[in-house]
């Protein structure tokens, strides 16, 4: 058995969970924030049998595509009197960072 842990853009998560569910996979989602822009992410946990890993990864590839967005980063910490003019930056968002880890023991109570 394997545990698939994936960090995806929060905009991709509803479609991803729907596609996983239609293929019979259960998943748990946790909202997360991080990175340079502190944009919203979702961390997906999905336990599957070894032979199902490639199918699950295919669902992620189909659901989590990369795209370019222009976003304004949060302003830096400034001293009184300093001024910061925010400039939008081009940022690649979407896609997925996926970890597949072995499960030594699984128990459903």
Give names to the regions the model predicted.
Residues 1-109:
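Positively charged, small/polar-rich N-terminal and surface patches that mediate targeting and assembly
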